[in-house]
C-alpha cells in the first residue's frame, strides 16, 4: 500500500532551526512507517526561496543520508502554511517499478545563457544519464516537468527548446 504524507516544521525559527525540526519529524515518521513494512520511495521538497535555501538544504543530514538515497525533487514553491520548507513523502510496502530523475542546472551552467540554451542543456544532461542503461527517451520517457523561473520572460525559450528536442527524438510536442 502507498502512503503519502506532508511534513512541515511547526516552529517559526530560523531556516536552520526549521530544518533540524523537519529532520527529527521525518526520521520519526519514517521509523513508524518502517514498523508497518513501508519504506520511503519518493519525496518532493518545497522551498519558499530556493535561491537562498537550496545549498543549505542539500548539505543537511536529512538530505544527504535519507532523501537523496531515493527519488527526490526540489522545487521552489512556498508552502501554504508559511513554514518555508515542507516535504511530501511517499512510502510503500510495494516494489518501486519506475525510474525517477530530478535534475537541475548549476549556477555555472546557467551563467550567460538564455532559457532556450538552458533547456537544451537540461535535456542533454538527461539524455547522457540514460547512456548504458538500456533505455531511450522515445521509448521510455513518460513525463517531464520543467520548473521555470520568471515564466513570463522565459516561457518561449523553454517551449521552443523542448519542442526541438522532442522533434529530434521523434516525440510528439503536444
Language-model features: locations:
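Short, polar/acidic, helix-capping and beta-turn segments at strand->helix junctions
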Residues: 1-174
Amino acid at each position: 500500500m502507498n502512503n503519502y504524507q506532508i511534513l512541515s516544521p511547526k516552529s517559526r525559527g530560523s531556516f536552520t532551526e526549521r530544518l533540524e525540526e523537519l529532520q527529527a519529524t521525518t526520521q520519526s515518521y519514517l521509523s513508524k512507517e518502517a514498523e508497518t513494512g513501508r519504506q520511503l520511495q519518493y519525496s518532493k521538497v518545497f522551498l519558499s526561496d530556493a535561491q537562498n535555501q537550496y545549498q543549505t538544504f542539500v548539505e543537511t543530514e536529512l538530505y544527504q543520508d535519507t532523501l537523496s538515497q531515493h527519488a527526490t525533487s526540489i522545487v521552489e514553491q512556498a508552502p501554504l502554511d508559511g513554514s518555508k520548507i515542507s516535504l511530501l513523502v511517499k512510502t510503500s510496502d510495494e516494489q518501486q517499478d519506475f525510474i525517477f530523475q530530478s535534475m537541475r542546472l548549476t549556477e555555472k551552467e546557467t551563467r550567460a545563457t538564455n532559457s532556450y540554451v538552458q533547456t537544451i542543456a537540461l535535456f542533454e544532461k538527461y539524455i547522457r544519464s540514460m547512456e548504458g542503461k538500456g533505455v531511450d527517451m522515445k521509448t521510455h520517457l513518460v513525463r517531464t516537468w520543467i520548473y521555470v523561473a520568471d515564466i513570463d520572460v522565459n516561457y518561449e525559450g523553454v517551449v521552443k527548446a523542448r519542442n526541438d528536442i522532442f522533434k529530434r527524438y521523434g516525440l510528439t510536442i503536444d
